[in-house]
Amino acid sequence: MNNLGSVKTNFTAGQVSPNLLGRGDLKIYENGARRLENVIIHPTGGVSRRRGLKYICRAEQATRLLPFEFNTEQIYLLCLSDYKMKVFKDDRCIAELETPWSGNQLFQLNYTQSADTLLLVHPDVPPKQVTRNNNEVWLISDWEYYTKDDMIYMPYYNFYQKKPQLWASGTSGEITMATDADVFLSAHVGSYLKYQSGLVKITEVRGPRDIAGTVIKKLSATGKTNDWAEAAFSDARGWPVSVTFHQNRMVIGGSRDLPNRLWLSKSSDLFNFDLGK
């Protein structure tokens, strides 16, 4: 008895389930295969063998790979390891940078990309952005929030159910501030306090109720007030856990001390978290 064979040229249905074997009445059966291994299916229906692998370099310890797609023709691979990042294009390493993330922190990183900027967040590390300019120069830098009239429009938050009163020794320059409750930790150094319409950067924590700081935006008064708030993100309070883009806004999802909170930037102004009046 002669064996009959047929020519099959269309595999757009991919690898079909064993439950469909023998179902010649279905279009998916006609355009599928029982097994497709190490091949690439083309939109026109044909298949070709996948490309082979090529040794480029040795990965160092724990490594995480992230895509960086500027457009369909400019695609990069970011190789993150212990406090280091290598950038690959095609078959070579084109840049190597130092990073703030240890090998143990790599798999807690969350990221999102817009055009030539990749945003990365980790709950224990200040958020960073990876940028690539037209000359393929790569940089890692801190987020820069929108600033107007000396006010930095980052997210602020009241961490207390009953907010302590806060007062200041002056309205400009180097000042001291105090509260009527235990508030401050040594990790607050470098973070910001929004005091009424003014802004202060903490330079020294002298105790749980006393700090020294530099006025960034002039204070309107110095008396006791409950109208103040901390920067939502700091070494004392933790940093963003996740980040994405939605309807042309940057969305920050949770932080170490505020795991269930969302912050959305102004539309078309990704680093502006001004709440308005």
Feature map (PLM): residue ranges:
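Surface-exposed loop/edge segments in extracytoplasmic proteins
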Residues: 91-97, 200
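Generic recognition of flexible, low-complexity loop/linker segments
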Residues: 107, 190, 200, 238-241
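Ser/Thr/Gly-rich low-complexity blocks that favor extended beta-strand/coil architectures
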Residues: 126-135, 182-211
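A generic structural motif
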Residues: 173-179, 207-218
